[in-house]
Amino acid sequence: MSTVNVLRYSALGLGLFFGFRNDMILKCNAKKKEEQAQYEEKLKLVEEAKKEYAKLHPVVTPKDVPANASFNLEDPNIDFERVILNAVESLKEAST
């Protein structure tokens, strides 16, 4: 009779242990899933805010300067990218 009781209580203990473990795993997975959903919602709101900001504050691009325009290289606000690109364009036009 004692062996039967040992087996019975051992099975009960194992059942409680695995039940508790399974419950904790399920709760942890549910919590992670909820946090991921909240994070995705925040990302969605950030993207919407970026789109709205882009609508309210459009990017102003400087107008293209003709290739034959002269530049003041002493100007502290000179756009070197534009100067170089215009020089390359003028060289392309001259070679064709």
Curated annotation (Swiss-Prot):
Molecular function per GO: proton transmembrane transporter activity; structural molecule activity
Gene Ontology terms describing biological process: cristae formation; protein-containing complex assembly; proton motive force-driven ATP synthesis
GO cellular component terms listed in the entry, alphabetical order: mitochondrial inner membrane; mitochondrion; proton-transporting ATP synthase complex
Keywords per UniProt: Acetylation, ATP synthesis, CF(0), Hydrogen ion transport, Ion transport, Membrane, Mitochondrion, Mitochondrion inner membrane, Transport
Residue numbers bearing the N-acetylserine modification: 2
Annotated signal sequence range: none
Alphabetized Pfam families for the sequence: ATP-synt_E
Subcellular location: Mitochondrion; Mitochondrion inner membrane
Family the UniProt entry places it in: Belongs to the ATPase e subunit family.
Reported function: Mitochondrial membrane ATP synthase (F(1)F(0) ATP synthase or Complex V) produces ATP from ADP in the presence of a proton gradient across the membrane which is generated by electron transport complexes of the respiratory chain. F-type ATPases consist of two structural domains, F(1) - containing the extramembraneous catalytic core, and F(0) - containing the membrane proton channel, linked together by a central stalk and a peripheral stalk. During catalysis, ATP synthesis in the catalytic domain of F(1) is coupled via a rotary mechanism of the central stalk subunits to proton translocation.
Quaternary structure (record): F-type ATPases have 2 components, CF(1) - the catalytic core - and CF(0) - the membrane proton channel. In yeast, the dimeric form of ATP synthase consists of 17 polypeptides: alpha, beta, gamma, delta, epsilon, 4 (B), 5 (OSCP), 6 (A), 8, 9 (C), d, E (Tim11), f, g, h, i/j and k.
Official protein name in the record: ATP synthase subunit e, mitochondrial
Gene transcribed to yield this protein: TIM11
